[in-house]
């Protein structure tokens, strides 16, 4: 299964680079930084128990709605809301309270916003412009495979601190795909800087959980996880600009880090 929504830094194209390091002797899969949850959807069904967590309220609402059998309601919302600029900004300005409405709004915006970007203003409002894409696919939302895996998953809106404090057993496999070490630390819906990275590394080094992390390489991260870096690989990115032109290729190095 591919991710339900596009997510910056998603690992769909990199799974083959690290999936062989996923342990086969663990019964519980845990992902504290869910995002698009590419790894969860790829290997989650191999585990008896599954825990998916993120601090992004709308993302968690989407996963919970699907798990609770509300996919059809989201699909109906998509069918009844046009892919045009007027409708887009009406939906973007809407502030629903019911979690299924929150999930529907979020899914619509993820499918129709520019380049699937995730950007918020200082007040926490989503401020990505309309994408102007002629076609987009939302049929996947009613794919029963998503319901089947999510209905058997504990879905949490919790920080990584909570996850490590709550789950601490050698039978747990924790996949970590945290925000990268970057000068950009405020994501609108959360902040994640060097202080958080240090805290995460302390959990990583002291927990009983078997942890596998994939993260962009920086001197800070290399120093933080010295002795735990198993391998590394090159990753190339190329973004499509608003003008339609393809941007310059960006080369990065990703580290595969594990504590077992």
Swiss-Prot record:
Query: Which terms under GO biological process does the entry name?
Result: DNA restriction-modification system; methylation; mismatch repair
Extent of the signal sequence: none
| Catalytic activity entry | a 2'-deoxyadenosine in DNA + S-adenosyl-L-methionine = an N(6)-methyl-2'-deoxyadenosine in DNA + S-adenosyl-L-homocysteine + H(+)
Question: Its gene?
Answer: CVIBIM
Recorded source organism is: Paramecium bursaria Chlorella virus NC1A
List ligand-binding residues for S-adenosyl-L-methionine: 7, 11, 54, 177
InterPro entries the UniProt entry points to: Ade_MeTrfase_dom_2, DNA_methylase_N6_adenine_CS, M_m6A_EcoRV, MeTrfase_D12, SAM-dependent_MTases_sf
Q: What is this protein called?
A: Type II methyltransferase M.CviBI
Entry keyword set: DNA-binding, Methyltransferase, Restriction system, S-adenosyl-L-methionine, Transferase
Gene Ontology MF term list:
S-adenosyl-L-methionine binding; sequence-specific DNA binding; site-specific DNA-methyltransferase (adenine-specific) activity
């Amino acid at each position: 299964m591919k991710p339900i929504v596009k997510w910056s830094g998603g690992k769909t194209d990199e799974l083959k680079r690290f999936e062989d390091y996923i342990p086969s002797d663990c019964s519980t899969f845990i992902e504290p930084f869910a995002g698009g949850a590419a790894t969860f959807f790829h290997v989650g069904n191999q585990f008896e128990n599954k825990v998916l967590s993120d601090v992004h309220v709308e993302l968690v609402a989407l996963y919970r709605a699907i798990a609770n059998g509300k996919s059809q309601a989201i699909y109906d919302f998509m069918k009844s809301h046009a892919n045009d600029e007027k409708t887009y900004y009406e939906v973007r300005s809407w502030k629903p309270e019911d979690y299924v409405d929150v999930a529907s709004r979020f899914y619509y915006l993820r499918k129709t916003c520019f380049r699937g970007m995730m950007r918020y203003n200082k007040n926490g409002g989503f401020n990505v412009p309309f994408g102007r894409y002629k076609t987009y696919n939302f049929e996947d939302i009613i794919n029963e495979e998503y319901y089947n895996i999510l209905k058997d998953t504990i879905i949490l809106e919790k920080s990584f601190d909570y996850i490590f404090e709550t789950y601490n057993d050698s039978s747990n496999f924790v996949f970590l795909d945290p925000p990268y070490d970057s000068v950009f630390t405020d994501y609108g819906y959360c902040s994640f800087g060097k202080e958080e990275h240090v805290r995460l590394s302390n959990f990583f080094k002291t927990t009983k959980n078997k942890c596998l992390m994939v993260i962009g390489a920086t001197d800070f991260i290399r120093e933080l996880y010295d002795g735990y870096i198993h391998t590394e690989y090159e990753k190339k990115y190329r973004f499509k600009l608003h003008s339609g032109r393809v941007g310059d290729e960006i080369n990065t190095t990703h580290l595969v880090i594990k504590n077992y």
